C-alpha cells in the first residue's frame, strides 16, 4: 500500500514520519522529532513533520499576543458579554490614538492598546518573513515566497507606520476591526480621490486577484494528479509521459 496521501484520500494510517529534504549538520530543525496529530488528520492525514523552528514559534507567540489583546478589547467594549460580542463582532474596533497624542505612547484606553497590538503584530509578521526566507535558503529553494510576502508587508507598513510617520500622528493609521478598517479605506479613498478610478489601483487589484487565481489553478491541478505522483515530479515536470505533463496538457487544451 502506498504511504503517500493527500487531502482527497479517504483512508487513514500511521506511516513512518518523512523527514523531507536532508538538512546540513548542526541545523536546529535537523534535531527536531516529527509528531503526528490525530486532529489534523481529519483534513487529510496531515502531520506536523515540519517543525516551526525558533523564528516560527516566536512569530506564533507574538501573533497570539496581538490576537488576544484585540479580542480582550472587543469583549471589554461590550461589557464582557459573550452574546453581544458575537452579535456585534463585525462592528467592534480597536482604534488608534487621536491626533493630539502625536507619536507618544497614549493611555491604554485612548489608543495605547492599539499601539501595543500593532507592535506585537508587526514583529510577528517580520519574524515570520524571516522564517519563510530562512527556510527557503536552508532547503535550497528560491526565495520567491519571501519576497512576495515582503510586498504585502510593505503595504502593511506603509499604511500602519510610514504614512502616519510622515503625517505626524498615529491617528492616521488603520484601526483593527472588520467594518472599522473598511470605513477607514472608504474615507482614505474619498480623501485622495476615488481609488476605483485610479489606474494603479486597477492594475494592482488585477495582478493581485489574477495571480491568486493562477496559483489556485496550479495548486489544484497538481493536487488532482498527486495520486499519479505529479507533486513529486519537480525535475521531470517538462518530460513527456509524466503526470505533470498530463496536467499541463489539460490547461493547454482548455486555452485552445
Curated annotation (Swiss-Prot):
Any one biological process term the GO annotation gives: photosynthetic electron transport in photosystem II
Alphabetical list of Pfam families matching this protein: Photo_RC
Cysteine-cysteine disulfides: none
Membrane topology reported for the UniProt record: Multi-pass membrane protein
Top-level taxon: Bacteria
GO terms of molecular function: bacteriochlorophyll binding; electron transporter, transferring electrons within the cyclic electron transport pathway of photosynthesis activity; metal ion binding
Residues noted as binding a ubiquinone in the record, renumbered to the chain: 251
Transmembrane domains' residue ranges: 52-78, 110-139, 142-167, 197-225
The keyword Isomerase is assigned to this record: no
NCBIfam families xrefs: pufM (TIGR01115)
Function (record text): The reaction center is a membrane-bound complex that mediates the initial photochemical event in the electron transfer process of photosynthesis.
Annotated protein name in UniProt: Reaction center protein M chain
Record organism: Pararhodospirillum photometricum (Rhodospirillum photometricum)
Amino acid at each position: 500500500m502506498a504511504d503517500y496521501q493527500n487531502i482527497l484520500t479517504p483512508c487513514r494510517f500511521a506511516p513512518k514520519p518523512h523527514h523531507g529534504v536532508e538538512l546540513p549538520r548542526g541545523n536546529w530543525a535537523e534535531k527536531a522529532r516529527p509528531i503526528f496529530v490525530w486532529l489534523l488528520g481529519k483534513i487529510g492525514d496531515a502531520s506536523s513533520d515540519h517543525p516551526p523552528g525558533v523564528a516560527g514559534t516566536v512569530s506564533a507567540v507574538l501573533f497570539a499576543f496581538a490576537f488576544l489583546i484585540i479580542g480582550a478589547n472587543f469583549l471589554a467594549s461590550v461589557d464582557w458579554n459573550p452574546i453581544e460580542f458575537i452579535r456585534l463582532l463585525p462592528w467592534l474596533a480597536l482604534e488608534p490614538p487621536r491626533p493630539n497624542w502625536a507619536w507618544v505612547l497614549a493611555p491604554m484606553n485612548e489608543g495605547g492598546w492599539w499601539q501595543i497590538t500593532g507592535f506585537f503584530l508587526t514583529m510577528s509578521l517580520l519574524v515570520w518573513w524571516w522564517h519563510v526566507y530562512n527556510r527557503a535558503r536552508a532547503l535550497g529553494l528560491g526565495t520567491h515566497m519571501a519576497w512576495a510576502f515582503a510586498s504585502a508587508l510593505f503595504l502593511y507598513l506603509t499604511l500602519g507606520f510610514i504614512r502616519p510617520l510622515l503625517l505626524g500622528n498615529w491617528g492616521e493609521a488603520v484601526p483593527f476591526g472588520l467594518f472599522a478598517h473598511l470605513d477607514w479605506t472608504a474615507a482614505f479613498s474619498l480623501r485622495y480621490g476615488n481609488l476605483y478610478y485610479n489606474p494603479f489601483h486597477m492594475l494592482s487589484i488585477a495582478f493581485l486577484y489574477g495571480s491568486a487565481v493562477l496559483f489556485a489553478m496550479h495548486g489544484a491541478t497538481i493536487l488532482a494528479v498527486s495520486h499519479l505522483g505529479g507533486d513529486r515530479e519537480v525535475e521531470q515536470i517538462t518530460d513527456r509521459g509524466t503526470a505533470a505533463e498530463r496536467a499541463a496538457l489539460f490547461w493547454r487544451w482548455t486555452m485552445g
